[in-house]
Amino acid sequence: MAEQKKKGLSRLNKAILFLITSAFFFALMNMFVRLSGDVPTIQKTFFRNFFALFIASGAMIKNRCSIILPKGARFDLFMRAACGYAGVVLNFYAIDRLSISDASLLNKMSPFFAIIFSTFLLKERANKVQWAIILTAFIGALFVIKPSFQNAELGASIAGCCGGMCAGAAYTFVRRATGKGVKSYYVVFFFSAFSTLVAFPLMLLDFKPMTLVQTLMLVGSGVSAAIAQFCITTAYSYAPAKEVSIYDYSQIIFAALIGFVVLNQVPDVLSFVGYAVIIAAAFVMFRYNNRKTKE
């Protein structure tokens, strides 16, 4: 029994590590997307997923994995890819039209939506303590992001919120697919291939020539996205959303650090308050879930 408990705790810690790593690379991806400038949104999503597809294909070849869709998980893979791509498009659309803080906040609703979708699709019900911790982290995110909806376009704000919802749904279908034995690298490969094929014809309708710098930025976004996708897919295969999704908020901290180093941005007092709230919530969730695992 003690050995089983230890194994369960190890899986939880692995999920946390992979999710935090994913958050870091998603923060890098957003930085590259922003630095790519006035490239059309669909064009950005194409190059982001096109380069990610190369990395995902390499993982498929290394593991000698067939590209044939696994039986029993086809619906989950299609839904993960469709929801995931919709989330990427809506998120990029929001980033291009809202302040980065507004767009980031709306996208960070995805873990909250993941728990809601997990309740219906996976029958994983969070208890009152876990709900309270997640809401506390969300409040901390508000301190950090300080959204100014007064100056935001209503359509872009709705798009950003829907993007977070789509991302939350996608992560839930990741859990369903990997729970049926689908490997994490196959999930990433299928998503990248699906997104590239969907984006290509749409991109041709409004293609804009890019500079070398813009091209390099989008290559960076694709590589960062691929690494982040591998990590987040693996994270949700180790543990349910209700136990680890809180750590996705660490992306806010990484974004602030990257902003300081790359853009010379210094967080204000409210941001530091938010950091403290988020880190405290993450620590409480970690201790609470570990205690539950031992019981």
Language-model segments: what does each one mean?
Residues 129-146, 270-289:
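Hydrophobic transmembrane alpha-helices of multi-pass small-molecule transport proteins
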